[in-house]
């Protein structure tokens, strides 16, 4: 794991220990899912995929819960927004990756 992934993993671990996060099913599942994806693969794509998933998940939670969010999740959100805002995520590259992943999962049909 690179340094960004390790830092994110440690922050996810701290967030999971937070009683507010543990009490909320959506946030605890999001943290576990993202931590699992980070440890499952060492590729840069896994980090990009995880921060995209976290950004969407935290944003939707924030908007649907009257703009209240646990501080540990806010820490993670501000950490990953640096990478997203700096353009470290190449959306075209991510789109091609997702298309390729989808095409690989489609069964081949021979006539």
UniProtKB/Swiss-Prot annotation:
Recorded superkingdom: Bacteria
Which biological process annotations from GO are given for this protein? bacteriocin immunity
Q: Which UniProt keywords apply?
A: Bacteriocin immunity, Plasmid
Keyword Protein biosynthesis carried by entry:
no
- CC terms in the record's Gene Ontology section: cytoplasm; plasma membrane
The keyword Transmembrane belongs to this UniProt entry's keyword annotation: no
InterPro entries from the entry? Ta0600-like_sf
Known function: Could impart immunity to carnobacteriocin-B2 to naturally sensitive host strains.
Q: What is this protein called?
A: Putative carnobacteriocin-B2 immunity protein
What species was this sequence derived from? Carnobacterium maltaromaticum
């Amino acid at each position: 794991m690179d340094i960004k992934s390790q830092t994110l993993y440690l922050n996810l671990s701290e967030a999971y220990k937070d009683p507010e996060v543990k009490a909320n099913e959506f946030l605890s599942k999001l943290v576990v899912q993202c931590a699992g994806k980070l440890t499952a693969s060492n590729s840069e794509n896994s980090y990009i995929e995880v921060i995209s998933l976290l950004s969407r998940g935290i944003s939707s939670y924030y908007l649907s819960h009257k703009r209240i969010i646990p501080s540990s999740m806010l820490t993670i959100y501000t950490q990953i927004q640096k990478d997203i805002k700096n353009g470290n995520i190449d959306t075209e590259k991510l789109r091609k990756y997702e298309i390729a992943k989808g095409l690989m999962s489609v069964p081949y049909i021979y006539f």
